[in-house]
Amino acid sequence: AIRRARRKGRRVVVPTPVVAQVHRGGWDRASMDRTLKAVDTFLETSLDTAMHAGVLLGRTDLTHAVDAIVVAEASNSLTTILTSDPDDIGRLVEADGAGRGVYVEAV
């Protein structure tokens, strides 16, 4: 999915908590390194973004803070979120205000 986005000329941006979520061991290190090298920008999570994510979790009764951080980071731009959990991400996007230019794509 990241390679496809790159071929389409899209920037690949990843909030740093996502790396913690996927970096749990038991994975192919070379594959992880290739994936991380394909990322254009890693976003540090600000206090405002973390608080926005908390509000989204409260609105949805979901518990995955990393998902909420991804949506909070995306909320101010025309963005496609690539995710293996489109249901929860979709709920968070809706809670943030439908039609704001954030799209969810399952991978």
Each model region followed by its residue ranges:
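Alpha-helix N-cap/helix-start capping motif
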Residues: 16, 26, 47, 86-87
